[in-house]
Amino acid sequence: METAEKECGALGGLFQAIVNDMKSSYPIWEDFNSKATKLHSQLRTTVLAAVAFLDAFQKVADMATNTRGATRDIGSALTRMCMRHRSIETKLRQFTNALLESLINPLQERIEDWKKAANQLDKDHAKEYKRARHEIKKKSSDTLKLQKKARKELLGKGDLQPQLDSALQDVNDMYLLLEETEKQAVRRALIEERGRFCTFITFLQPVVNGELTMLGEITHLQGIIDDLVVLTAEPHKLPPASEQVIKDLKGSDYSWSYQTPPSSPSSSSSRKSSMCSAPSSSSSAKGGGAPWPGGAQTYSPSSTCRYRSLAQPATTTARLSSVSSHDSGFVSQDATYSKPPSPMPSDITSQKSSSSASSEASETCQSVSECSSPTSDWSKVGSHEQPSGATLQRRKDRVELLRDTEPGPASGGTLGPSGEEAPRPRMSPATIAAKHGEEVSPAASDLAMVLTRGLSLEHQKSSRDSLQYSSGYSTQTTTPSCSEDTIPSQGSDYDCYSVNGDADSEGPPEFDKSSTIPRNSNIAQNYRRLIQTKRPASTAGLPTAGLPTATGLPSGAPPGVATIRRTPSTKPTVRRALSSAGPIPIRPPIVPVKTPTVPDSPGYMGPTRAGSEECVFYTDETASPLAPDLAKASPKRLSLPNTAWGSPSPEAAGYPGAGAEDEQQQLAANRHSLVEKLGELVAGAHALGEGQFPFPTALSATPTEETPTPPPAATSDPPAEDMLVAIRRGVRLRRTVTNDRSAPRIL
C-alpha cells in the first residue's frame, strides 16, 4: 500500500511536470511567430528589390544581345540567367506567401488553443486525483478503525478479522486505481505536448516545400554561369561572331550621313518640290537632260528624271505669272522644268500620262510645260526645248484674242520679244520615224494629234496611277479649261479644236488653253494601257451628273455642238489649298460620238450613237495596213463628234475656214485613206458610261501587238473633204446657265 502510494505520487509529479513544460513553452512559440512575421516582411521587401534588380539585369542582357562587341551568345546566356533568376524570384514570392499563410497565422491561432488545452488537462487531472485520494483516505481510515477493533476482539471471540482483510484489500485496490488514473493523465499530457510539435511541422511543411522549389531553380544557374565563363574566357580576342560583323559590313551601303527632310517650295520652283525633291539628287546625277531623237533636249519621263532636279539653273525656273488652274486648284508647274505626267517607275517608253485632257500626240514638243494658265500654252516651248520639224499653225484669231487678256510673258524662252506665240510644233514624219523606226505620213500625224489632243477623255471611275492626282498638285493642267473655278482665268469658257487651225465661223472663241500636249510621249507604249483603270486627272471641274441618255443633244444645239453648263463662281478668287480629303469623285466631260460612214459607200449611214461614247483604236491588219500606225500615233481612247463622220451636214459643209481650204485640198488625198481606215476602227467604238449605253459587239479584244506597216499609197476621194472638214471643225462648246460649279456637263 505504501508502494502504490509512492507510485501514484511519482506519476502525479510527472504529469505536473509535463503540464508545466507545456505552460512554459508558450513564450517560445510566440517568439517564434514574431520572428517569422519579421522574416515575412523582409522577404516581401526582398521580392520587390529582386524585381527591380532583375529588370536592370534584363536590360544588361538585351544590351549584350544588341551590342556588336558582345556577341549574341553572351547576350543569350545572360538572358537565360535572368530568366532563371526571375523564376527564383517567383518561387521566393511563393515562399514568402506560404510563410505567412501556412505557418505564422495558423500557429498564432494554435498557441491560444494549446494554452486552453493544457489548462483543461491540468484541471481534469487535479480533480480526478483529489477524488481518488479522498476515497483512498476514507477507506484507509475505515480500515484503521477496523484494525483497532480487531485487536480488542482478538482477546475476545475474533469475529472482526474477515472484515479487516476485506477493508485492506479495498484500500489496495483504490491505490491501484489511483495509479492507473495518474498514468492516464500523464499520457494525455504527453500527447498534448507532442501534438503541438506535430501541428507545427504540419504548418512548416508548405513553407519548406516552397523553399526547396526556389532553391531547385538555383541549381540551373550552374550551367549558365559555366557557359558565360567559357564565352568570356578571352576578353582581348574577338570571337568568330564578332569577326562576322566586319564581314557583313563589307559591300553594304552603310553611311552615317543623315537624310534631311525636303525643303519647302520656293517662289521660283514648282509646288511639287515639297513632295518631289527628296529623291531629286539621284535624278540630277542620272542625266535628266539627254537629247532625244526628236532633236529637242528634253527631260525623260522615266523614274530617273521624273523628279525636279536640284541642279536646274535658277534663272530659267521663274514662276509662271499666272498659277491659276481652272480645275486643279493651282498649277504648280514650271515653264521649262515640267514634271512628267506620270511618276510611274517604268521605262522611258512606257512612261505615259493619262490625263483627261492630255494625249500622246506630239513627239517633238516633248518637254513643253502645258499649263492652263494663259501665259503658258502648249505650243510655247523653252529656249532649250525648241523642237525640230515643221510646225502646225494655230488659229491666229484665238492667239490674238488670248494675247489681249494675257499678262506679261513667263519664263525665258516662252514668248518672243513681241509677246507673240511661238509657232506650234507639228509632229513631223521624221520625228515619228525617229521614235518608231518607221515613216509616218504627215496626215497620219495631224489626224492622230487632233483626235488625241482635243477629244481624248477618260472614264469617271478611272483610277490614275500618278501621284499628282491624289495629292492635289497638278504636273500640268490636264483638265479642260472651260470651267470657271474659284481661281480666275483670263479667257472664255469655251474651246474648240480643229485639224488645221482654221477660224471658227460661229463667233470668235476667247481662248484655247485645254489642248495639253505631254512630253516624251511614246504613243505606241501607251496603247497597252487602254483598258486599264485610271483615276481622273483633276480634283475639281469634272461633271458629277450622269452621262447623257441616248436621246441626243438638246433641240436647240446643232448635232456637233456639246453644251457645257458653267457659271462663274461666287467665291473669292483665292488659291485653293491642298486638300487632305483626297480627290473628288467626279466625271470628266464627255463628247458625243457618231458612228462613221466609210467614204467608199456615200449612201451608207452608220448607226447613229447619240450621247457620249468613246472609241478605242483597234487594229485590223488584214483590212487596214495603216491601222497599226494609227494606233501608235493615237493609242488612247478617242472621242469623236457625232457629225465628224457620215454624210455632210449643213454645219460641216459651210464651216471651212478662210485659210484652210487650200491646205485641205492638199491633204485630202492622204487623209482619205486614214479616214477610211479610221472609220472601220471607230465602228467598233467602246461605249462609255456605267451601263448607260450598250457595248457594241463589233469591238473585240484590244490587240496588244502593234506591228509597224508602211503607210499606204495616197489616194484621192472627194467624199473625204466633208468628213475632214467636220473633223477639223471639232466640237463647239456653248455656255448655258447652271448652278453646278464642279465640272462641265455635256447635255
Swiss-Prot record:
Known outcome of mutating residue 138 to D: Marked reduction in RAC1-binding, loss of increase in RAC1 activity and of dorsal ruffles formation in response to PDGF treatment
Principal location class: cytoplasm
Residues annotated as domain WH2: 719-736
Effect of residue 137 to D: Marked reduction in RAC1-binding, loss of increase in RAC1 activity and of dorsal ruffles formation in response to PDGF treatment
Domain IMD residue range list: 1-252
Modified residues (Phosphothreonine): 260, 643
Ribosomal protein listed as a keyword: no
Coiled-coil spans in chain: 135-159
CDD domains: I-BAR_IMD_MIM (cd07643), WH2_MTSS1 (cd22060)
Sequence positions bearing Phosphoserine: 264, 441, 579, 601, 612, 624, 634, 639
Keywords for this protein: Actin-binding, Cell projection, Coiled coil, Cytoplasm, Disease variant, Intellectual disability, Phosphoprotein
Residue span of region Disordered: 256-302, 318-441, 457-522, 543-599, 638-664, 691-720
BP term (GO), one: cell projection assembly
Effect caused by changing residue 157 to D: Marked reduction in RAC1-binding, loss of increase in RAC1 activity and of dorsal ruffles formation in response to PDGF treatment
UniProt KW Cell wall biogenesis/degradation keyword: no
GO-annotated molecular function: actin binding; actin monomer binding; GTPase activator activity; phosphatidylinositol-4,5-bisphosphate binding; phospholipid binding; small GTPase binding
Mutation effect (residue 152 to D): Marked reduction in RAC1-binding, loss of increase in RAC1 activity and of dorsal ruffles formation in response to PDGF treatment
Leader peptide range in chain numbering: none
Compositionally biased region (Polar residues): 368-378, 480-492
Chain intervals with Basic and acidic residues compositional bias: 397-406
Effect after changing residue 127 to D: Marked reduction in RAC1-binding, loss of increase in RAC1 activity and of dorsal ruffles formation in response to PDGF treatment
SUPFAM superfamilies according to UniProt: BAR/IMD domain-like
Record's subunit section: Interacts (via IMD domain) with RAC1; this interaction may be important to potentiate PDGF-induced RAC1 activation.
Associated pathology: Intellectual developmental disorder with ocular anomalies and distinctive facial features: An autosomal dominant disorder characterized by global developmental delay, mild intellectual disability, ophthalmologic anomalies, microcephaly or relative microcephaly, hearing loss, and characteristic facial features including long, upslanting palpebral fissures, bitemporal narrowing of the forehead, arched eyebrows, and epicanthal folds.
Protein family: Belongs to the MTSS family.
Protein name: Protein MTSS 2
Organism classification: Eukaryota, Metazoa, Chordata, Craniata, Vertebrata
